[in-house]
């Protein structure tokens, strides 16, 4: 009897340890979930930003940087132990495997074989643009089923309240020619409600301006120094400037204004709209209970439904609900909507643009793995790495390709192709090896046959251009900016040049 009691105690202790490790991994996954640098995890060489690319060989090999102490939303503090221990003790518990170190050897990365973007499920090639609508649906179903997850089919009521409508304040001065509007967008279903704060800047002298729409990482107040922009009440990562216990404070204002050069955008006649991505779905793994997932509890992802939506699909779905508002908003050209995103939100912009044809131009900035970069190159961030660090971003089916990218019968060039014939712009950064700039370029190149099918020019080259030398005179554009994983004025300048060239 004594030995049975001993075994029971040992098993109970082991179970307790496993539960604690899984909980620790859940909290640990949240460490990368903000846009402190918005790189998924570290790992790429030559970076100067925390969470971007590792600054030492050991950090690069491990694929993440270590922060000794982290303040989390429940006010508990956890010491972060070495990634080696986490991968061995936790990664194996969660997924039954360790994550391989990142590859930066181009001779290894070039060993892959892609299918044609014009090939159907049986390998047959479509030959005319009349066949394109059905083929595009096949591609979107493929990505929904195997990577991003299907959004629910149920409808929501979209209700809008104007919170503020006046002149914008930029650089500390009231701007007479700039109109700033703040709208509370309520998504309502079955007695539940989600609020999204939409901030819209538009030139006062243009009756209908084409509009860039993109989500931000830290709240609308972080995108400018305008003191009248409402402080976000949604979850924020406590490591970001001006955030205390996962809530933004006044000190967070303008903390990412360099990513939103509002004056320069408006000077060129464009409007720009943004919302905090956490308004749509807070960026941590809670089993899909909060945000817009909570509006559809019957559509929650689980082991029995591995192809239901993850957070990227939820953010993309939210962008479409914001498009519902913008296409009816005074001063905005409903035929001039353009979706833009950086990093994980670049992935989001691609998925939103692929599904919603109201976005006439789609822009991906440093979107990397699960975005514009080819997964089968396994260069920089891998499928296993991203699924382990951020299990809530994609659907469960995508995990079966962890360290098995060679078994994928699809890749991101087909996602780019699904946007055709609408123009798409892909931007990379020279130091952002983690996001695989060449893999991003090659997706555009291999998507080009879908554009040629529509009589449009794609991206012909398979070689990276010189830094700060944009390429692509047709419907697919690309540039490699000098520098790190970021979204800067130079990037926006190229986006606007490309937009104008394509009729926006």
Where do the protein language model's features map onto the residues?
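N-terminal pre-domain segments of enzymes
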Residues: 94-152
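Conserved strand-to-loop "acid loop" that flanks and positions the catalytic carboxylate
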Residues: 420-437, 481-483
């Amino acid at each position: 009897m004594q030995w049975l009691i001993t075994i029971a105690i040992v098993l109970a202790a082991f179970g307790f340890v496993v539960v604690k490790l899984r909980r620790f991994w859940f909290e640990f996954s949240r460490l990368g979930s903000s846009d402190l640098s918005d790189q998924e995890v570290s790992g790429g060489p030559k970076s100067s930003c925390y969470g971007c690319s590792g600054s030492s060989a050991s950090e690069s090999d491990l694929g993440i940087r270590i922060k000794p102490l982290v303040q989390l939303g429940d006010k508990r503090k956890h010491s972060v132990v070495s990634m080696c221990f986490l991968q061995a003790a936790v990664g194996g518990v969660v997924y039954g495997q360790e994550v391989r170190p990142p590859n930066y050897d181009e001779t290894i990365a070039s060993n892959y074989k892609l299918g044609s973007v014009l090939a159907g499920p049986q390998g047959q090639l479509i030959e005319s643009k009349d066949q394109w609508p059905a083929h595009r649906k096949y591609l979107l179903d493929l990505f929904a089923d195997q990577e991003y997850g299907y959004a629910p089919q149920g409808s929501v009521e979209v209700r809008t309240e104007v919170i503020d409508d006046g002149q914008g304040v930029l650089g500390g001065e009231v701007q007479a020619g700039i109109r700033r509007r703040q709208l509370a967008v309520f998504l309502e279903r079955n007695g539940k409600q989600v609020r999204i704060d939409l901030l819209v800047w538009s030139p006062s002298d243009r009756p209908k301006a084409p509009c860039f729409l993109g989500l931000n990482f830290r709240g609308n107040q972080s995108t400018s120094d305008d003191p009248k922009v409402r402080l976000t009440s949604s979850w924020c990562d406590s490591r970001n400037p001006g955030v205390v216990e996962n809530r933004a404070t006044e000190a967070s204002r303008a903390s990412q204004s360099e990513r939103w050069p509002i004056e320069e955008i408006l000077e060129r006649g464009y409007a720009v709209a943004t919302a905090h991505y956490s308004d749509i779905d807070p960026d941590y793994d809670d089993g899909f209970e909060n945000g817009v997932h909570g509006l559809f509890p019957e559509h929650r992802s689980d082991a029995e439904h591995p192809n239901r939506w993850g957070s990227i699909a939820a953010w993309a779905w939210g962008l479409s609900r914001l498009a519902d508002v913008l296409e009816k908003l005074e001063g905005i050209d409903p035929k001039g909507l353009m979706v833009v995103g950086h990093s994980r939100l670049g992935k989001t912009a691609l998925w939103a643009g692929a599904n919603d044809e109201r976005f006439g131009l789609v822009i991906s900035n440093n979107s990397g793995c699960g975005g514009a970069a080819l997964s089968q190159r396994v260069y920089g961030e891998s499928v296993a790495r991203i699924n382990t660090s951020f299990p809530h971003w994609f659907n469960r089916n995508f995990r079966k390709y962890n360290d098995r990218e060679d078994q994928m019968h699809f890749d991101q060039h087909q996602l780019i192709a699904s946007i055709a014939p609408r123009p798409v712009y892909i931007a990379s950064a020279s130091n952002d090896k983690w996001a695989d700039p060449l893999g991003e370029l090659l997706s555009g190149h291999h998507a080009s046959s879908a554009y040629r099918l529509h009589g449009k020019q794609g991206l012909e080259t398979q070689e990276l251009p010189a830094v700060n030398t944009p390429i692509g005179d047709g419907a697919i554009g690309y540039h490699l900016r000098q520098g790190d994983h970021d979204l800067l004025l130079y990037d926006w300048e190229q986006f606007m040049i490309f937009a104008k060239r394509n009729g926006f």
